[in-house]
């Protein structure tokens, strides 16, 4: 009997096992295509694509006597995004979907600011920053631990739970930002309207002065963290357990692994790192804000997946995404018709092509 089923004209399938050079070529092609589409849109907005991309990729530093300020701002955005992306990759590698980066970051920042406002003014700056970072890590880690415990004990969906916690964290931050009261240590005391105060001097990011350029110590910490995560995932028993659980929970159980313990431990570490990133962020920008995350919780998901959860790849992708974000803000100054969020469009096109 003849089979009358028609074959589709076009079949789209996900190709597995591609060689590294083909993957690199795919990524490069994705960026080129995204820039090409962006160029067409820039033309339609009466902007010069060549000049716009020049300003974007150089961060507006050419013939700029204040170029060091652009590099300082780049590092301010690069550090929290890189830490968050690395942290999310830990949970994602285990196929535990931590979508709560925004909330963990916000509450980590709030915890860090609490330490900054409460420690004596005489406390050493370096010690204060360490205490702030630890406080952010503990608060973030406890949120992650709560999420994982509810998942392993009651089967709570971690995606929905962490997503809802984002909004709870935002409302908590908003509450402290809008509640004028004597007990609220986060607000300016001399302002009629509620306004977040600058954190004390000893809680502000420690910097190494190199000429006019100020290098934030958080960058060094972050690069060390990259090395730690790489070794942790590829050279330790814990990293092996994460990979096995991610491949198959049943296989992990049959091999005698304590799956629940692995999930809780990894989720605690993931959320703790994001909380620490929040504390470092508030130390860097020197004030709390409901928008202090700059959407790193969401962008970090994109970065982690574009990098295929590889720590080294995450560094490269984070560097590119941060160039797009900071560069588009700089380029939009000279191209008035182009919004600074043009970077989001380019990110979306790249992600669409690769995934």
Where are these regions (language model features)?
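Helix-loop-helix "hairpin" substructures at the membrane interface of multi-pass membrane proteins
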Residues: 211-287, 311-312
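Short, non-helical or kinked segments that cap or interrupt transmembrane helices
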Residues: 46-51, 92-109, 152-161, 265, ...
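Short loop segments and helix-boundary regions at transmembrane helix junctions
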Residues: 17-25, 45, 92-100, 124-194, ...
